C-alpha cells in the first residue's frame, strides 16, 4: 500500500477543508457498483454530511435509484461535460436530505467520441469537481463498468477509489487491470489518488463460495479491505425500483445496516 495511503487533502488557503471525491469503480458489471454509490452516498448524508452523487454511467442506474426520471431530465452530466449546460442547471437538489445529484442517461454514451478532440480531455470532470469541493463533504462518482474515458476522468478527478467486489467465482477477474489503470492515472494524471479500499458485496452466508472468495481476495490482494461486508439482501435489490436508497426504503433491513457501517468506516478513515 505504501506511503500514498497517508496522503491527505490539504485545506485550501481560506482554511476550509475540501471535500473528498470517491470514485466507485469496477469495470466488471453486476458487482453492486451503483448500489454502493447510491447507498454509501445516502448513508453519509444520513450522518449529516453534505453529499453530491455524480452518475457517470450511461445506464443511469444511480439517477433512477434516487427516483429521478432519467429520460425526463433536460440537463445531465453529458451536457455539463460538453459545456452545453451550467452546473446550477444540472444539479438536482435534495434527492434525499443533504444529498444532491448530477444525473445521467443514455446520452452520456456519446461522450466518449465527442471528448476525443478536446484538449486535456482527461481533466474535464476535475475542472467541474474542483469547483464543488468547497460545497460538499463528499462527492461520490458512480463510474461506468468499463475502463473508458469517463472512468479515466473519474480517476483523474478523485481523491480515492472504492472498489466493490462481488462474492462470486470470478470476483478477481479484471481487477488487476483496474489496479494497473489506477496506478497509471496516479503516476501520470493525479498524484493525490489513493486506494480507498475494497468492499465485498452480495455476500451469502449460506454458501461456502462467499467465504472462499473473501478469503481468496484477502490472501491475494494487497489493498485496504473494509471490515463491512454487504450481504445479498432482497430489500436491497428492491429499493432501486422504488427510487429510494435502502436506508429510506427499509431502514431496519440488513442492507441498510451494512451500508451505515460502511459509511462509518469511510468517516473513520477521514479522521485517522
Where are these regions (language model features)?
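Short, small-residue-biased leader/transition segments that mark boundaries at the very start
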Residues: 1-7
